[in-house]
């Protein structure tokens, strides 16, 4: 592993128990999402969705490779807690790239969790910064802190006109989609304002946790301008998948095991159209991770 970049604050104050607890939650979030079944167009325990190049075992290997980096993201966020938030990303990016390299080694070149490395790296660094600043580690604070790390990111990386546009730049210029960068820079509003309250409300009503998570995935698909979907199916594919998810929610969503048949059918339709809502899956990982934060906070005396 590469050394953590030199920074301005001693991060040794973070107890190892806290580092391990937050990192374990982030790792479990990745596993919880991929094992959740059935999911429309996504890899799960039943099939590989619209993907021909990856399987469930790839995601398990990938999550294991990423796990070792999660405490380092937290430590980095703590170690630069006195730096301006705008300066954090430039030091965090090399750690993320090294983590990506480990992911690709573990999966023989398959991109399983690149989006999650970006989001979980930001959120873990935000947790480290908040801890070092003695600020409450809440979902809202974590996401707003991550947003400050990403200030100006969309402008810098999506609006520039390169001779050879990246996929993200092309989708931004053609469809106005900002993808993972835009969601992070805005402080994860789809999660904080919609998915997380929805998931918590379903759990409070006594909904089975897996069914609640599947219902929350539908909510995210219905609202998210998912660049993974748009890159495969264009504006038409994105509109279709959003409408399908919205229709299922209006019909009552995923309330009981009998409703899983609707998801099986949705999955087959996505496979036929070669659509995979990977961006929404990444946001579901964020949602589950943030929903569990209170489990750790008692160790932090919150």
Curated annotation (Swiss-Prot):
One of its GO terms (biological process) is prosthetic group biosynthetic process. GO terms for molecular function: ATP binding; triphosphoribosyl-dephospho-CoA synthase activity. The keyword Transferase applies. Keywords: ATP-binding, Nucleotide-binding, Transferase. InterPro entries: CitG (IPR002736), TriPribosyl-deP-CoA_syn_CitG (IPR017551). The keyword Oxidoreductase does not apply. It holds the Pfam family CitG. It catalyses: 3'-dephospho-CoA + ATP = 2'-(5''-triphospho-alpha-D-ribosyl)-3'-dephospho-CoA + adenine. Its EC number is 2.4.2.52. Belongs to the CitG/MdcB family. This is Probable 2-(5''-triphosphoribosyl)-3'-dephosphocoenzyme-A synthase. It comes from Citrobacter koseri (strain ATCC BAA-895 / CDC 4225-83 / SGSC4696).
């Amino acid at each position: 592993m590469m050394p953590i970049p030199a920074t301005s604050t001693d991060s040794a104050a973070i107890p190892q128990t806290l580092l391990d607890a937050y990192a374990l939650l982030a790792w479990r979030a990745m596993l919880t999402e991929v094992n959740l079944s059935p999911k429309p167009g996504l890899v799960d325990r039943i099939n590989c969705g619209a993907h021909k190049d990856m399987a469930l075992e790839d995601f398990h290997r990938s999550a294991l490779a990423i796990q070792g980096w999660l405490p380092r993201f937290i430590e980095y966020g703590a170690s630069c807690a006195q730096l301006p938030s705008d300066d954090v990303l430039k030091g965090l990016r090399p750690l993320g790239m090294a983590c990506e390299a480990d992911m690709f080694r573990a999966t023989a070149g398959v991109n399983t969790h690149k989006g999650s490395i970006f989001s979980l790296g930001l959120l873990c660094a935000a947790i480290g910064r908040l801890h070092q600043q003695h600020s409450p580690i809440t979902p809202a604070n974590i996401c707003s802190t991550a947003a400050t790390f990403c200030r100006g990111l969309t402008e810098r990386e999506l609006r520039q006109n390169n001779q050879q546009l990246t996929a993200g730049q092309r989708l931004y210029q053609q469809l106005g989609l900002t993808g993972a960068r835009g969601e992070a820079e805005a402080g994860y509003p789809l999660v904080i304002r919609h998915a997380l309250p929805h998931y918590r409300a379903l759990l409070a009503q006594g909904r089975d946790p897996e069914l609640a998570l599947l219902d929350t995935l539908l909510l995210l698909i219905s609202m998210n301008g998912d660049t993974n979907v748009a890159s495969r199916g264009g504006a038409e594919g994105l509109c279709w998948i959003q409408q399908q998810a919205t229709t299922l929610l209006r019909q009552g969503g995923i309330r009981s095991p009998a409703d899983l048949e609707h998801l099986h059918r949705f999955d087959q339709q996505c496979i036929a159209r070669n659509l995979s809502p990977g961006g929404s899956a990444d946001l579901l990982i964020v949602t589950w991770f943030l929903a569990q934060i209170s489990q750790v906070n008692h160790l932090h005396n919150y």
